[in-house]
Amino acid sequence: PYQQLVGSLDQLASLEDASFDVILCHNVLEYVEDRKVILREFTRLLKPGGLLSIVKHNEVGRVLQTVVFENDPQKALDLLAGQDLETHSMGLAQAYDLGAAVEDLALEVQDYQGIRVFYALQDNHFKGQEGWRESMLQMELAVCQESPYRDIAFFQHYRLKRS
């Protein structure tokens, strides 16, 4: 059965060890300060062989989108210098290295794919045209598993396995 949990670390701490086959955490860890603690809890909660699905901002994709779509080289330079990204709806997003965040945990990256490889670079003028979404989806799906495309995407989707 599917169970959606919305809450805090306290709620996670109240759950039994190895009680989940799959945990989804999409576009969350950029907005919390204690991501290492959260990842440790996810590891505890996953059954051996369980999967953790993480979607996160990709710093390379953020810089590309800022230069190409927003036409704001100074903001892109600030991002390159380590400044956090102010998002439209979620607030301050802090970049992080997923490999470093899980290096001492019983989690291993199995695979990753790019999300919004080209979408985030397109002018909004085109996005309302008939057939645009279908064509863009076809293009995104054609490259989402392939480097270098997945490495420049705005978001990346990681699949990690609990050992």
Q: What name fits each language-model region?
A:
Residues 51-79:
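Conserved class I S-adenosyl-L-methionine
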Residues 1-14:
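Conserved SAM-binding strand-loop segment of SAM-dependent methyltransferases
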Residues 3-5, 110-113:
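General small-molecule cofactor/ligand-binding pocket signal
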